[in-house]
Every structure is written in C-alpha cells, then in structure tokens.
Amino acid sequence: MADDMKHVKMEVMRYNPETDDAPHFVTYDVPYDEQTSLLDALGYIKDNLAPDLSYRWSCRMAICGSCGMMVNRVPKLACKTFMRDYPNGVRIEALGNFPVERDLVVDMTHFIESLEAIKPYILGNDRKPSEGPNKQTPAQMAKYHQFSGCINCGLCYAACPQFGLNPEFIGPAAITLAQRYNTDSRDHGAKERMPQLNGENGVWSCTFVGYCSEVCPKHVDPAAAIQQGKAASAQDFVIAMLKPR
C-alpha cells in the first residue's frame, strides 16, 4: 500500500482456545484509501502484522455470506464495509450470538442444522423433465422472490435478541427459507415444514424486534417472512382443531 494513504486504528478481537481464557482485543494500525474494504484491511493485518489471524472469507462480492462479523457492534459483511466510513477507528468482533472458535471464526453448526431442518428445497413435485418447464406467473414468483435472496450469512442471527436468549430458536434465516418454499407454487411440502415452524423454537419465539431485516445485506426482510410464517402457523392450528379426527 502507498505511503500517502490514510491510517486507522483497528481493534480486532483475538482468541486462541489453546492459550486464551477469554477473547481480548489487539489494536493494529492499518493504511486505507477510499476503496479499502474491511476485508482488505483484515487481509493487510494477516499479511503484514498478524499471520495467525483467523477469519472467514471467500467471494469478496457479498454473494457467499462467509465474512459476517460485528463492526462497532453491528452485524455486517466485511466485504461490503469500507474503512472510509470509520476514520476515527473501528472495533471488530466475531459474529454475535454464536460460539467463538478462534478469533473472528464462529461455530455455525446450529445455524446450518436449522436450515437443514426446514427442508429448504422443493418437495412433493413429481413433474418429469419430459413434461417441459414448470412455469410460473410473475404473481406466483413475486410471492417468494424476495425471500429467495438469502445468502446464509448469519447476520440476522447476530442481530436477533431472541436467538441470543434462546440458542435453540431456529431463527430468522431458517424461517425465511421455509416461507420461501411454502409460498412457491411448485412446492407441496408445507405440511412437512409446519412442525418446525409451529414448535416451541419456531415462529412464535420471535417477538418482532425487526433488527434482522435492518442488518440483512440482501434486503430479504426476514422479519416479514416470520410474520407470514406466524399467520400460516395460526391457520394450520385452526385447521387442525376443526378437522375431524
């Protein structure tokens, strides 16, 4: 990096489970210009100051969802966050509400298991390729299109106070994906997903703070998906009560 670049102090959370009792912060002096992302800055630290710094990243384009972390206590993607917005310094921490494995790397096992549990794929559609494309109208696609933009970054879980209180809550992304498929005209698997949504750790754990939608980097609006999920859950309950046994 050029000598005439600006410099900023970055407080970065460090934690090595083999040597540290608890996470701590180390301050690094990092050069930056108008185009330097937080991910670039972390790369500078790793290449020049702390080779043992651990963090996740991949695409650099807000597609893979790998580089989520807390930036001044706000969940953000490092690749979409720019150092020019933090001229007075910045504090970087591992993604909130997740167990820390090392430095900025968190254990996302429960997150992945929650996504798997709601079966995020089309179910019950026996249409054969020989029958041609499974067409949808624009109106049918509009029902789920926004919810299909989720990149599984986990920022909504870091923002969710209920997930912080109850780590068994399946969470915003899982419920959003369930709603994405439940509202897809090609899918017939809502009945298989409803037990997850109706359960103790399903949609009714949400108290509708709405912060999950504020931090979503793809504007998926998981808060709206959860409220739709509550309506579907209530309808499912009423139908079950009235249905003859």
From Swiss-Prot:
InterPro entries: 2Fe-2S_ferredoxin-like_sf, 2Fe-2S_ferredoxin-type, 2Fe2S_fd_BS, 4Fe4S_Fe-S-bd, 4Fe4S_Fe_S_CS, Beta-grasp_dom_sf, Helical_ferredxn, Succ_DH/fum_Rdtase_Fe-S. Its EC number is 1.3.5.1. One of its GO terms (molecular function) is electron transfer activity. Its cofactor is [2Fe-2S] cluster; [3Fe-4S] cluster; [4Fe-4S] cluster. GO terms for cellular component: plasma membrane. The keyword 4Fe-4S applies. A menaquinone binds at residues 15, 227-230. Binds 1 [2Fe-2S] cluster. Binds 1 [3Fe-4S] cluster. It catalyses: a quinone + succinate = fumarate + a quinol; a menaquinone + succinate = a menaquinol + fumarate. [3Fe-4S] cluster binds at residues 160, 206, 212. [2Fe-2S] cluster binds at residues 59, 64, 67, 79. [4Fe-4S] cluster binds at residues 150, 153, 156, 216. It holds the Pfam family Fer2_3. One of its GO terms (biological process) is tricarboxylic acid cycle. Keywords: 2Fe-2S, 3Fe-4S, 4Fe-4S, Cell inner membrane, Cell membrane, Electron transport, Iron, Iron-sulfur, Membrane, Metal-binding, Oxidoreductase, Transport, Tricarboxylic acid cycle. Residues 13-98 form the 2Fe-2S ferredoxin-type domain. NCBIfam families: dhsB, PRK05950.1, PRK12385.1. Fumarate dehydrogenase forms part of an enzyme complex containing four subunits: a flavoprotein, an iron-sulfur, and two hydrophobic anchor proteins. PANTHER family: FUMARATE REDUCTASE IRON-SULFUR SUBUNIT. Belongs to the succinate dehydrogenase/fumarate reductase iron-sulfur protein family. Two distinct, membrane-bound, FAD-containing enzymes are responsible for the catalysis of fumarate and succinate interconversion; the fumarate reductase is used in anaerobic growth, and the succinate dehydrogenase is used in aerobic growth. This is Fumarate reductase iron-sulfur subunit.
